[in-house]
Amino acid sequence: MLGFLFKKVFGSKNDRYIKRLRPIVAAINALEPQMQSLRDEDFPVRIAEYRQQVEEGRKLDDMLPEVFALVREAGKRVFNMRHFDVQLVGGMALHHGKIAEMKTGEGKTLVATLPVVLNALTGKGVHVVTVNDYLAKRDAAWMGQLYNFLGLSVGVIVHGLDDEQRKAAYGADITYGTNNEFGFDYLRDNMKFYAEQLVQRGHNFAIVDEVDSILIDEARTPLIISGASEESTGLYRHMDEIVRKLTRDTHFTVDEKARTAMLTDEGVAFCEKLVGIDNLYDPGNITTQHHLMQALKAHNLFRRDVDYIVKEGQVVIVDEFTGRLMPGRRFSDGLHQALEAKEAVKIEAENQTLASITFQNYFRMYAKLAGMTGTADTEAVEFHQIYSLEVVSIPTNKPMQRKDFADAIYRTKREKYDAIAQAIAELHKAGQPVLVGTISIETSELLSTMLKKTGVPHSVLNAKHHEKEAEIVALAGQRGHVTIATNMAGRGTDIVLGEGVRELGGLHILGTERHESRRIDNQLRGRSGRQGDPGSSRFYLSLEDDLMRLFGSERISGLMEKLGMEEGEPIEARMVSRAIENAQKRVEGHNFEIRKTLLDYDNVMNQQREVIYTLRRDAMSAPDLGPTMEEFLDDVLEDVYAPAEGGEAPSADTVAAVWGRLADVCNITRVMQPAPALPTRDEARAAVLSILHELREDTGESYRDIIRYFMLEELDRCWKEHLRNMDHLRDGIGLRGYGQRDPKLEYKREGFAMFQEMLFRIKEGVFRSLTRLRVQRVEEEAFRHKEQPAAVAYSGGEAEAGPAQPHREDPKVGRNDLCPCGSGRKYKKCCGA
């Protein structure tokens, strides 16, 4: 009650923020005559002057009115488009590092130019992040005209560019690109061997377009760079054959709400018999069990033409939020291979993670982050908790005129689709354009078939027909036009109403099913009623829809019975609509917890990732790695000598063991023969440094490159192995909950211990390699072409040719021979991994 009264008297927090910006808007408007008097050639000169002022210490906030007024005038001259006052407010919200919620058609692309130009004055670069390559190229070319008019440079990052092109794009004042490309470039930079090979130049300021899609919808999917592993693909086919013989509810159960499939006791016994093993859950059968469960999920939780399609003999993922195809992106953990076996297409080798990061942790690296979207308010809590971003609702330039009708709810899908087809036919006959939103390719094609039978001409826009996306969406507002679009395909392209359509009521949005997120529903509605245009929307639902069936059916079914529904008769009751909205809120809360849990686990990895990447950057850029090598050596010798320094005289066995480790790790027998007594730690240190000194004498100026090569080589090898071990730890850590232990704390504790061990293995590995080098002829170029990992998940990079390897003193070790380090493991599973 008190909160309501406070809001009534003082306005909401959002209202108070916008009110504070009004005097600045007035100041910008007051500068308009001054900017109108400038000649075209004066604009780049002004920008150069502002840049100089920033270098001299003037704050961006003090310059905001002048710069915004200059950009507004530039917009008028280049595009004949003047920024509205509400767009100035949106620009200020972005500059302040907030999320600007602006309705469809309010000109988000133009709004971004204001803070982009202001922040580009620092010379540290501004990144504008979009959801796909098409929008990145379109906006860079379109808004690039304005930036070039002002004397600012523009780059664009899209799939297929080489490192030189990427470096040039990042070197520009303003860089457009997709979230995937920015994230992968960061990971790839941290796999490079020379500082001059890096393409990114830091993370200063980013504006994320469609911020809800990128920071929330895609936050459950980490970016992963991977290389092929050695596992055979035959096992996937075998497990697929077994799963086809299982019977639901007898051999396994499926929980669609939790998206899990589990074997029953009878199913376990049946599978053990078919595979020919005694115990499926024996540690020795963990690989078989894993592939069996993935095959079970592939057959029972993933649907063709909903979660993926088969195109040109490949399984291609369909983005559940946008309906777009995601070529090059693969499900991890063997699931994609299980789907390939299910669809009887070629099975690609499973990949091993070489580098990964979540979008949450990538975007939190920016000194300042802002975002734009038409729908963010429903996720304001998550934006604040995860990213410390506030959502500001920007008023529309003209009042909203769209009418949102109550949901029409039917008992069965058949009744619902019949009603939809009839409604479309009536609207088409009246000449009112209709945009039909579906949540799967399957539904869009079913409706298309129904409309063909009734003779209603229409366009279909889904992942199978995405080539003409912009063209189809642009025509969607024409008189009598019917467009069926999967989810939010076509976001970013305005639907302009054709002649005479306003008089007919504008564009009508027809939703065929509620999405599990209210925000996605609001995005679909938001395609109508842009810039004060008339419009309308209605969702058609049935009790058989996934959301109703899984999350709200019992209560809603009870309401239906009380209201006495008959076949084919819809119900339009606010009570039912509220029950559906509550079901959506439950799903949103569930998904938020999933994303938060992912972040909690990735925060552990993020701390480790930062340490490793800092080590790599130091190794790449340090003019002299000598002090680092001495520090590594001290740590190694401290560990080697620990058994012999307990206070008492070491036994003969202890002395032999220490000599053995000195020989293995430091190759000390190259300059010192084993004796009954151990050398002091200082003597051992001097001996190892003498080996390195000899290497420096033999290699001259190439010494630093050789040290760096082996340091980065060992670091990458150990980090790759550590990522795999952390994946395995994460997979099994949930079981700790049964032992009354917090899985997250256990993961953090054990992960830290594993990380400490890995750091030590890096130090050992560097000395094991360097002390065995015998130089015949070392060319610096041999170290400048370090082989990059072959397969890049999501982005598909190609491998470069590898270098000629330096000659070693030891005889060549076969991959299946015992490792010479003395671990007792095969070379390919140990130092040769």
Curated annotation (Swiss-Prot):
May bind 1 zinc ion per subunit. ATP binds at residues 87, 105-109, 494. It is an enzyme of class 7 (translocase). One of its GO terms (cellular component) is plasma membrane. NCBIfam families: PRK09200.1, PRK12904.1, secA. Monomer and homodimer. Part of the essential Sec protein translocation apparatus which comprises SecA, SecYEG and auxiliary proteins SecDF-YajC and YidC. This is Protein translocase subunit SecA. It comes from Nitratidesulfovibrio vulgaris (strain ATCC 29579 / DSM 644 / CCUG 34227 / NCIMB 8303 / VKM B-1760 / Hildenborough) (Desulfovibrio vulgaris). The gene is secA.
